[in-house]
A protein has these predicted regions:
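Single, function-defining residue in the core of a domain
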Residues: 1-55, 63, 72-73, 77-85, ...
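Conserved beta-strand elements of the Class I
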Residues: 111-113
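Extracellular beta-strand-rich solenoid/capping regions of secreted or surface-exposed proteins
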Residues: 133-134
């Protein structure tokens, strides 16, 4: 039941951080680190990260010691403990908890998975500038994050964090293989920065459905559709080495496929063009329009991360700690949404 989801997430988190094998796998040096009974240990360190308040380390250390019923803990001790803890521990906790979400809401029997990215600034420090290129305009090292999000059930499912600029299409293709994303009866939703023939091929090979917004010049066939004035048409694409020559991400050749192109007119009078492999009989044009509108749920999710979880206000100055913050923020967002959903009264059906 959804009112128990937040509780299940907390219990799963406790199980993981107390598990000896989990601790050894995600401790930077298991032969040396966290071998004494000194606090904070591995469980306390992992618990600290999503619960900190983006305040000074000294104040956070004081609050943490009080909450954890420890005599005292210094900011330096917390920093050292975080350095001993690998960021992948937070990614696994986030993914394990995301898998517990109840899929209460579907779209005609399908889960919806929206894929999108965001860019942000990192602390302007020499060590980070070596790994994360500095944006000439902002003057700060930049990161590029990508996530898969269930907009109907308001849950982040998987995510990646890289230096910016990164190729969004490559990141999206990697994200499709995440354990909470692959193998599901779902419709994948993509904005116009993602479409590529290689991505379409991967989705087709996975046997999954998709809706993508494309530019008017995405493919020659799409350009022809735009000029024709048609509103919903099947297009046959023959993709060969000559056409692929300028593509950064390569599809396996030869590749022949069919896509459906749909024209959507916005209230502003502007037009958008969507490609999909959903059948017209089951998903007429109005359903395709509705599906793409639902993709905006991930924008709402990112807005929450920026303005409520403060995802860009990192509490660490090192890459390992910054990635800890990132995945801990996603975990916290999911936990908050689960708690809110569980507290809401059931909807009363109208006669």
């Amino acid at each position: 039941m959804k009112e128990q989801t937040a509780e299940k997430m907390m219990e799963r988190t406790k199980e993981l951080i107390r598990d000896g094998a989990f601790q050894r796998e995600y401790t930077e040096n298991p032969e040396r680190d966290f071998t004494r009974q000194r606090k904070p240990g591995f469980p306390e360190t992992v618990t600290y990260v999503p619960g900190n308040c983006r305040e000074s380390m000294e104040l956070n250390a004081e609050k943490f010691a009080e909450a954890a019923k420890m005599e005292s803990v210094s900011a330096a001790a917390l920093c050292k403990a975080r350095a001993k803890t690998g960021w992948k521990a937070f990614r696994e906790i986030f993914e394990e908890c995301a898998a517990l979400r109840p899929v209460d809401k579907l779209f005609q029997g399908y889960e919806l998975i929206a894929v999108d990215g965001m860019k942000g600034e990192m602390p302007n420090l020499p060590l980070l500038r070596e790994t994360y290129p500095v944006n000439s305009r902002q003057g700060y090292p930049m990161f590029h994050a990508m996530s898969a999000y269930d907009p109907l059930n308001e849950t982040f499912l998987a995510a990646s964090f890289q230096a910016a600029p990164a190729d969004e299409r490559e990141m999206a293709m990697e994200l499709l293989d995440a354990k909470n994303v692959k193998g599901k009866k779902a419709i994948r939703l993509f904005d116009r920065g993602f479409p590529s023939v290689a991505l379409i091929q991967k989705l087709e090979n996975m046997g999954t459905h998709f809706v993508m917004r494309v530019t008017a010049d995405f493919l020659t066939e799409v350009s022809g559709f735009v000029r024709s004035g048609a509103v919903d048409k099947l297009l046959r694409i023959e993709w060969d080495g000559k056409r692929q020559k300028g593509s950064k991400i390569k599809a396996n050749l030869p590749y022949s496929f069919q896509i459906r192109c749909v024209r959507i007119r916005l209230e502003s009078g502007e037009e958008e063009f969507l490609i999909t492999n959903l059948p017209r009989k089951e998903f007429p044009k109005r359903k395709i329009r509705e599906l793409y509108r639902l993709r905006w749920g991930i924008e709402t999710g990112y807005n929450y991360l920026k303005n409520s979880v403060f995802i860009e206000e990192f509490t660490s100055k090192k890459e390992n700690g910054i990635k800890q913050d990132f995945y801990a923020s996603l975990w916290a967002a999911n936990l908050t949404n689960a708690a809110i959903a569980g507290a809401m009264p059931p909807m009363i059906k109208k006669n």
